[in-house]
Amino acid sequence: MNINATLIGQAIWFALFIWITMKYVWPPLQKAMADRQAQIAEGLAAAERGKHEQELAAKRSADALREAKEKSADFVAQAEKRAQQIVEEAKGTAKIEADKVVAGAKAEIEQEVERAKQQLRERVAELAVAGAEKILRKEINASAHADMLAALKQDL
């Protein structure tokens, strides 16, 4: 093969082409690739941050859910405790009312018993006077002998 002027001219033009490409074309291409690489790195970092934030959000939501469950359990326990207190208060009030009713009934029964005893005493006194009158065959004056009849009632 002969090395002639065409080959030398082509080599010179090729060297000039490489120099122009390295001087004017290559730096913007390198800058574009570096920018793209930085964008990709930022995207990956953002994805990593997003994943981390998602994990934190999941943890916060689990904590909030647990806390809500604890609060609801506390509310239920407080409600049950309050309901038990209300039941106990109602039982106490009912017992007091029942005791009052029983005491009132006992007092009323005692009054009725005393009234019946009083009526019975009066009736016994009348029967005693009637019996004594029949025995003596004379009339005993109830107003004249009121002291004696009162003493008889007391004895009975």
UniProtKB/Swiss-Prot annotation:
Gene3D superfamilies xref list: F1F0 ATP synthase subunit B, membrane domain (1.20.5.620)
Keyword terms: ATP synthesis, Cell inner membrane, Cell membrane, CF(0), Hydrogen ion transport, Ion transport, Membrane, Transmembrane, Transmembrane helix, Transport
Highest taxon above the source species: Bacteria
One matching Pfam family: ATP-synt_B
Transmembrane segments: 7-26
Broad class of the protein's primary localization: membrane
Compartments in which it is found: Cell inner membrane
Gene Ontology cellular component terms for the protein in this record: plasma membrane; proton-transporting ATP synthase complex
A GO term, aspect molecular function: proton-transporting ATPase activity, rotational mechanism
InterPro entries, alphabetized: ATP_synth_B-like_membr_sf (IPR028987), ATP_synth_b/b'su_bac/chlpt (IPR002146), ATP_synth_F0_bsu_bac (IPR005864), ATP_synthase_B_chain (IPR050059)
Membrane-topology annotation of the record: Single-pass membrane protein
Family: Belongs to the ATPase B chain family.
Function as written in the Swiss-Prot or TrEMBL entry: F(1)F(0) ATP synthase produces ATP from ADP in the presence of a proton or sodium gradient. F-type ATPases consist of two structural domains, F(1) containing the extramembraneous catalytic core and F(0) containing the membrane proton channel, linked together by a central stalk and a peripheral stalk. During catalysis, ATP synthesis in the catalytic domain of F(1) is coupled via a rotary mechanism of the central stalk subunits to proton translocation.
Quaternary structure, from the entry: F-type ATPases have 2 components, F(1) - the catalytic core - and F(0) - the membrane proton channel. F(1) has five subunits: alpha(3), beta(3), gamma(1), delta(1), epsilon(1). F(0) has three main subunits: a(1), b(2) and c(10-14). The alpha and beta chains form an alternating ring which encloses part of the gamma chain. F(1) is attached to F(0) by a central stalk formed by the gamma and epsilon chains, while a peripheral stalk is formed by the delta and b chains.
Protein name (database record): ATP synthase subunit b
Organism from which the protein derives: Dechloromonas aromatica (strain RCB)
Phylogenetic lineage: Bacteria, Pseudomonadati, Pseudomonadota, Betaproteobacteria, Rhodocyclales
Gene that encodes the chain: atpF
